[in-house]
Amino acid sequence: MASLIQVRDLLALRGRMEAAQISQTLNTPQPMINAMLQQLESMGKAVRIQEEPDGCLSGNCKSCPEGKACLREWWALR
């Protein structure tokens, strides 16, 4: 199980990552990583970076049956 410090250090080394990538790298369940990332965000140590829908290749994200699953969410240190 990863610690909050390990998540912070991994973000420092890699720059920005998705929660799923952090989960795989640290071999920790994604709900736990999500909670740690939210904690880092509330402490002002990490920032959530969301892609804008205008980056959608087809331009149909609003009517996408997957509910904007194509939009990625990244995490980085402040």
Swiss-Prot record:
Signal peptide: none
Keywords: DNA-binding, Iron, Iron-sulfur, Metal-binding, Repressor, Transcription, Transcription regulation
The keyword DNA-binding is annotated on this UniProt entry: yes
Pfam (any one): FeoC
Annotated transmembrane regions: none
Residues engaged in binding iron-sulfur cluster: 56, 61, 64, 70
Family affiliation: Belongs to the FeoC family.
Function: May function as a transcriptional regulator that controls feoABC expression.
Record's protein name: Probable [Fe-S]-dependent transcriptional repressor
Source species: Escherichia coli O7:K1 (strain IAI39 / ExPEC)
